[in-house]
Structures are given as C-alpha cells and as structure tokens.
Design a protein with these regions (language model features):
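FMN-binding flavodoxin-like domain, especially the glycine-rich phosphate-binding loop
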Residues: 177-219, 223-226, 269-284, 294-393
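Active-site neighborhood of phospho(di)ester-bond hydrolases with catalytic His/Asp-centered motifs
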Residues: 49-51, 73-81, 100-104, 165-169, ...
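Structural motif
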Residues: 45-47, 75, 139, 162-166, ...
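Short, charged N-terminal beta->alpha structural module
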Residues: 255-277
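Active-site metal-binding motif and surrounding structural segment of the metallo-beta-lactamase
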Residues: 44, 55-102
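Metallo-beta-lactamase
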Residues: 4-8, 102-154, 200-208
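Short acidic active-site motifs
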Residues: 88, 289-294
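Conserved beta-strand hairpin/beta-sheet module of binuclear metal-dependent hydrolase folds
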Residues: 3-66, 156-159, 163-167, 263
Length: 393
C-alpha cells in the first residue's frame, strides 16, 4: 500500500491485505480484501498510532521507517489490542527501544496477557485515562475511552489541532484501500458494524455522546478509508445503527434456507407477490450467502420473513445459524413473518418462533405459511394472507 498523506503532519502507513479469506476467521473479505490502518503524527515528538496484523508486519515496518526518515518515534499509541492491530506491536517496540507505549490500564493488562509480563520495562508504559492529553508539540491528543466498542480496552484519540478523530474500530469498513478506493463507504461499513461492533449499541451510543461536542474534520479508523467527507451522514448512520433501528422501515428481507429448492421457490414466489404491490424486497439464500451479508440486510430492513425447511425434526442448519447470529448481535424491534416446509412433520415455524422469543421486541405476523413439499392451494392462500399483513402497515 502506498503511503498516504492525511495532513501535512500526519501520514497513513497502513497495509492492505488482499489475500485474507475470512476476517476473524468467519466473515468473507474476498474479493475486496481488508486494510490494517496505522498512522504517524510527525511533530516535535512523533507518535505512531497503532500497529497492524502480524501477517503485514514487514510492509508496515518499512512504511513507518520511510515516513520517519531516520528519526525515532517517541510513542506508540495503542487504541485497540485485538491482534489484527497489535500483532506487530512488539516488532516496533523492539526496533525502537526508547519508544514509550501509550495505553490505558486495560491496554496494559492485555499486553501482558498477549506478550508476557516481561515484554518491556514498566518505565516504557505511559498509562492514560479519560480525557488525558498527550502533547507532541503543535499537535495534542486527547483520549476518550470507548470500552466495549468492541473490546474492553478500546479508546479513541482526538487530535485537537487538526480536529482528527482516531476512532479505533468504530467507523471501519471491510475492503482494502487499493481494491475499494472508489466504492461507497456505507455498504461494507454497515456489514462491518453489525457483524463486528453491532452487539454493543449502548456502548457506541456512549461514545457518540462523548464525541458529539467535538469539531471533527477527519475520522481515521483502523479499517477502511480515512473519512473526510460526509461525516455528518456517517455519524447519523452510527447513531441509527447503534439503536438497532432499520434504515428502510418498509423494506423486507426474505431469508430462506432450502434443502431441495421447494422452500426457495416459495420465498421467490412471495418476493414476486410483494414486488407487484410496490414493496422493496431483498432476498437471501442462507445456504450460499456469507452470513455477514444476511445479518447486515436483516438490520437494514424493517421487516423480515424467514423461510426454512425442517431437517431431522429441527431447523435446517443454515437458518439455525442465521438466527443465532441475529440473537448474538442484538437483533430487535422488527416484525417477522414465517414460512415453514416439511414433507411429513413441519416444525420449522415453531422452532423459529422459539429462537425469536430470545430476542427483544420481535413481533410475529399472525399468518404462518406451512408447506408440505410444494405450494398448493392452501399454502398459496396462506401466502396471500401473509402478503396482506406485510403490506398493511
């Protein structure tokens, strides 16, 4: 990744990873890749803002050295200790033995857990707390703790002179900078938010409250592009997302899990009926779609229809996994319709209802479409009744 200038005194020294298949070993990041972001503030004193994943250490160290032009960094500021951001921390600390490590109390607890108690001497650790400042010369960092956005040690750093928020994982996005330079921020930021941070909406709200009084001209996250335009919209969406509110309250996601295609056919039939009535419909095949896309779409829409086959007397596994992801990420405040399929003993609707009862403020439509293999006159009538309910609000 080419070194980029954020401002005259601040450089981007992060690294693109276009070979990683699964982010956190579960979310697809192909073909768009992912970036591990790091920044250098050049002043009377020099601060490196976070490190990168160990798999990108060599390129990152080269980028940092190129920007330093023979100078030594005074500080490594650690806003987040997850290994994709701390994986190269020790490499930089060993290369520059006079450099101090800046973090909060929980940062240093995790450093000792990850790297051992003898990683470096105590006098190299500079502990900061809420609203503490670190002067670099013309630039000054003010630290705002952001616990559980999405790890307990997370903090942000606000550079007061140039009005830059170093936001840790908040406002991040999937996609390497090289491959997604012209891509809109929102789709992959939404997918990133709901799958990585989404469970912690209350904590995101607390962070948004802290930064609401700040004048922010630039946001520098740990994944995705540096944000300089449309910041008001980014903040608005984070406020909406962290309250688990839909972006499109009248749009519908139909998520289906079909074994031999009959349940999928019913889902597509429902989609056609709804579209004839002018409804915006997204449809997702849970047997082939990366679940992170399905989760993001479920939160985007105001209504959800679940269509699942019965399998071994239980839910077909792709639907069961989808519902577990939704529960884990705090899915709530939605209206949900159910379609079940079972050739001799359909049980999917009852089992989906049980899963949904574990979530907050989920309201089920009265009509359940129940198939015995394929749509027939009875189930078609049920589907028409469900369409009427979905369109009544």
């Amino acid at each position: 990744m080419t070194i980029q200038t954020v401002t005259d005194a601040i450089c981007y020294v992060g690294v693109d990873d276009n070979t990683l298949a699964l982010f956190e070993n579960q979310y697809s990041v192909q073909p768009m890749g992912v970036s591990y972001n790091s920044y250098v503030i050049l002043d009377e004193k020099i601060a490196v803002m976070d490190s990168v994943d160990a798999r990108a250490a060599e390129e990152w160290l080269s980028n940092v050295a190129q920007v330093l032009e023979g100078r030594n960094p005074d500080y490594l500021v650690v806003t987040h200790m997850e290994p994709d951001h701390s994986g190269s921390l020790m490499r930089l600390a060993q290369k520059y033995p006079e450099m101090k490590i800046v973090g909060n109390a929980k940062t240093f607890t995790l450093i000792k857990q990850f790297f051992g108690t003898g990683a470096w001497s105590e006098d190299r650790m500079l502990e900061v707390g809420e609203r503490d400042t670190l002067s670099l010369g013309l630039h000054r960092l003010r630290f705002l703790l952001a616990p559980m956005v999405h790890w307990p040690e997370v903090m942000t750093a606000y550079e007061e002179t140039e009005k830059i928020l170093f936001s840790a994982d908040a406002f991040g996005r999937f996609g390497s900078l090289e491959r997604t330079a012209r891509a809109p921020w929102v789709p992959q930021a939404r997918r990133y938010y709901y799958n990585i941070i989404g469970k912690y909406g209350a904590q995101v709200q607390a962070l948004l409250k802290k930064i609401s009084a700040l004048e922010i001209k630039t946001i520098c996250p740990l994944h995705g592009p540096v944000l300089t335009e449309g910041l008001e919209e980014c903040l608005r969406l984070y406020d909406l997302w962290s309250q688990w509110e839909p972006e499109e309250s009248e749009s519908i996601l139909i998520a289906h899990a079909s074994i031999h295609g009959n349940t999928a056919h019913a889902a597509k039939t429902l989609k056609g009926k709804l579209e004839k009535k002018g409804v915006q419909v997204n449809i997702c095949d849970l047997t082939v779609t990366d679940l992170s896309y399905a989760v993001a779409s479920a939160f985007y829409c105001g209504k959800l229809v679940l269509a699942s086959a019965t399998y071994d007397g239980g839910l077909f596994p792709p639907m069961r996994e989808f519902l577990e992801h939704l529960r884990t990420k705090g899915f709530r405040n939605r209206r949900v319709g159910l379609i079940e399929d079972g050739s001799w003993a359909p049980a999917a609707a009852r089992l989906m209802r049980t899963k949904l009862e574990e979530m907050k403020d989920i309201h089920l439509y009265e009509t359940v479409v129940s198939l015995r293999g394929t749509l027939n006159q009875t189930s078609e009538a049920q589907m028409d009744a469900l369409v009427a309910e979905l369109c009544a609000e």
